[in-house]
From Swiss-Prot:
GO cellular component, one term: outer membrane-bounded periplasmic space
Subcellular location per the Swiss-Prot or TrEMBL entry: Cell inner membrane
Membrane-spanning residues: none
Listed EC numbers: 1.1.2.7
Gene symbol of the encoding locus: moxF
Taxonomy, superkingdom: Bacteria
CDD domains xref list: PQQ_MDH
Cofactor: how and how many bound: Binds 1 PQQ group per subunit. PQQ is inserted between disulfide Cys-130-Cys-131 and the indole ring of Trp-270. Binds 1 Ca(2+) ion per subunit.
Binding partners and assembly: Heterotetramer composed of 2 alpha and 2 beta subunits.
The protein, known as: Methanol dehydrogenase [cytochrome c] subunit 1
Purpose of the protein: Catalyzes the oxidation of primary alcohols including methanol.
Keywords: Calcium, Cell inner membrane, Cell membrane, Disulfide bond, Membrane, Metal-binding, Methanol utilization, Oxidoreductase, PQQ, Signal
Disulfide bonds: C130-C131, C413-C442
Ligand binding (Ca(2+)): E204, N288
Length: 626
């Protein structure tokens, strides 16, 4: 009898399979369609190209000086606000730092909160969070007729949550990590097909990194791939790196570590993703090895510091390119991944992937197989590497700036913050330019030995940070840059200095504009071609998120979170004075509090401040008796 039932069930599943696949295809096609509409901003980076580029040009370089605030919304929280809100079909979805509240706003009357989710979390998560209590955003899934449209979020205390996009009710909730060992969640979820992709945080506490795919409809785990360890844990495809065997193939997830050090070896991924439907690969980077003290973990420490291309359906890695073997500086390689299609120097159209890394190098790979196309310095002041050998993919180190125990490294450029960090940059496909926010910060590094204790910081270095050579080291200003980069020529069309690091990222538009926020609390617009500053506005607090844009009822809006914090703001947020505190950030940003203070919210601009409240009746109370 049981055999009969099993057979019938199997036949039923086969019969349902086409319908299930059809619903998946429908939902994915709808998400792609929504991402192409400039009314919406449905995922981090706007679309699967992850390019933060909009075709909108109602706001352009001839009229940008007319931008005025249209409306604002306070989240009620004061820690750093990273990422950007989502806009879908006339609603804005706003997220916050811990405790990771979520708000749905009606764009016809944004003062009206449609629903709000305020989770109760384990407060112990705060103690194991590195570098403020930030969160990088939300994801949207459009539903399939049976499952409602969802807003997906991560919580610092390890949970992944799916909320009904219309009501805010919890549809499912799963545990992704374990705060007892220091594993938290700060990453924005990423929806691909019928899966939501989730990374991990906690390398500073010796957390072993992994990437997980969950069924977006149920929260069931589909696959999990680790950054270190045996091949079966890494999910390496049979043809892994087959076209670039010199990058390394099987067995290296353990062989490049001493003993079982890979079990506490880091490699978490808390940054940004991209996806190519043509290759069906998800692109992302793994972070720094643990501990920071390189003496304690001999070897290349694969596959930390790696750009992976993983199959979205199986999780199998088709390629992996390790940018910084045996990282000595905490150059966690999780930064933004931006696909493009461009002609190379030989005139051949290539499917490319560009990634500005913490280590001071901006990489461009062939995204079909991971082959390295170019590797150029983010700034000519990078000194840890002399160059990158394009044949081997290996960086050529300058030993003077290494961090070994018998050598006190001074004036190391970039600092552990990198010349680029979590900011989400933009790519203008018409100009073939990447607009990148830069941290112009260097450091002194003093390593020390320490034991591993689960749930405690596992770093092993004291850092002192200060402005890079182009900044003002006496006054601790000039810690940032904004640059326009061509990946094919390896040249910079323009670059401009900023008082502080450009931490949040950029937005490029067809209006010939580049927008970005600054730590000292400005939203700025520059000319895409020249870098000339065309407009700026002082916002209530420093910005560590990136701007986004959308249209509603024919009006273009530009929005950005305000709320200083994150790694550069830890001194201000937690009132720290020791320059080596905050893993060295407090000293570098000692002047930040002179220019901004804490806040938390979103501010939305339009030409002449046009918006829903031009009608004075919008938002007004109406008596039921009238």
């Amino acid at each position: 009898m049981s055999r009969f039932v099993t057979s019938v069930s199997a036949l039923a599943m086969l019969a349902l399979a086409p319908a299930a696949l059809s619903s998946v295809a429908y939902a994915n096609d709808k998400l792609v369609e929504l991402s192409k509409s400039d009314d919406n901003w449905v995922m981090p980076g706007k679309n699967y190209d992850s390019n933060n580029y909009s075709e909108l040009k109602q706001v352009n370089k001839s009229n940008v000086k007319q931008l005025r605030p249209a409306w604002t919304f306070s989240t009620g929280l004061l820690n750093g606000h990273e990422g950007a809100p989502l806009v879908v079909d006339g609603k804005m979805y706003v997220h916050t730092s811990f405790p990771n509240n979520t708000f749905a706003l009606d764009l016809d009357d944004p003062g009206h909160i449609l629903w709000q989710d305020k989770p109760k979390q384990n407060p112990a998560a705060r103690a194991v969070a590195c570098c403020d209590l930030v969160n990088r955003g939300l994801a949207y899934w459009p539903g399939d007729g049976k499952t409602p449209a969802l807003i997906l979020k991560t919580q610092l205390d390890r949970h992944v949550v799916a909320l009904n996009a219309e009501t805010g009710e919890t549809v499912w909730k799963v545990e992704n990590s374990d705060i007892k060992v220091g594993s938290t969640l700060t990453i924005a979820p990423y929806v691909v097909k019928d899966k939501v992709i989730i990374g991990s945080s906690g390398a500073e506490l010796g957390v072993r990194g992994y990437l997980t795919a969950y069924d977006v409809k149920t929260g069931g785990q589909v696959w999990r791939a680790y950054a270190t360890g045996p091949d079966k844990d890494l999910l390496l495809a049979d043809d892994f790196n087959v076209k670039n065997a010199h990058y390394g193939q099987k067995g290296l997830g353990t062989a490049t570590w001493e003993g079982d050090a890979w079990k506490i070896g880091g490699g978490t991924n808390w940054g940004w993703y991209a996806y190519d439907p043509g290759t069906n690969l998800i692109y992302f980077g793994t972070g720094n090895p643990a501990p920071w003290n390189e003496t304690m973990r001999p070897g290349d420490n694969k596959w930390t510091m790696t750009i992976f291309g993983r199959d979205a359906d199986t999780g199998e890695a088709k390629f992996g390119y390790q940018k910084t073997p045996h990282d000595e500086w905490d150059y966690a390689g999780v930064n933004v991944m931006m696909p493009s299609e461009q002609k190379d120097k030989d005139g051949k159209t290539r499917k490319l992937l560009t990634h500005p890394d913490r280590n001071g190098i901006v990489y461009t790979l062939d995204r079909t197989d991971g082959a390295l196309v170019s590797a150029n310095k983010l700034d000519d002041t990078v000194n840890v590497f002399k160059t990158v050998d394009l044949k081997t993919g290996q960086p050529v180190r300058d030993p003077e700036y290494g961090t070994r125990m018998d050598h006190l490294a001074k004036d190391v450029c970039p600092s552990a913050m990198g010349y680029h960090n979590q900011g989400h940059d933009s790519y203008d496909p018409k100009r073939e330019l990447f607009f990148m926010g830069i941290n112009h910060i260097c450091m002194d590094w003093e390593p020390f030995m320490l034991p591993y204790r689960a749930g405690q910081f596992f770093v092993g270095a004291t850092l002192n940070m200060y402005p890079g050579p182009k900044g003002d080291r006496q006054n601790y200003e000039g810690l940032g840059q904004i640059k326009a980069y061509n990946a094919i020529t390896g040249s910079y069309k323009w670059e401009k200095m900023e008082r502080f690091a450009v931490w949040g990222g950029t937005l490029a538009t067809a209006g010939d504009l580049v927008f970005y926020g600054t730590l000292d609390g400005y939203l700025k617009a520059r000319d895409s071609d020249t870098g000339d500053l065309l407009w700026k506005f002082k916002i209530p607090s420093g910005a560590i998120g990136y701007p986004m844009t959308y249209t509603h009822k024919g009006t273009q809006y530009v929005a950005i979170y305000y709320g200083v914090g994150g790694w550069p703001g830890v001194g201000l947020v937690f009132d720290l004075a020791d320059p080596t505190a905050g893993l060295g950030a407090v000293g570098a940003f000692k002047k930040l509090a002179n220019y901004t203070q804490q806040g938390g919210g979103v501010i939305v601009f339009s030409l002449d401040g046009k918006g829903p409240y031009d009608d004075p009746n919008v938002g007004e109370w109406k008596s039921a008796s009238k």
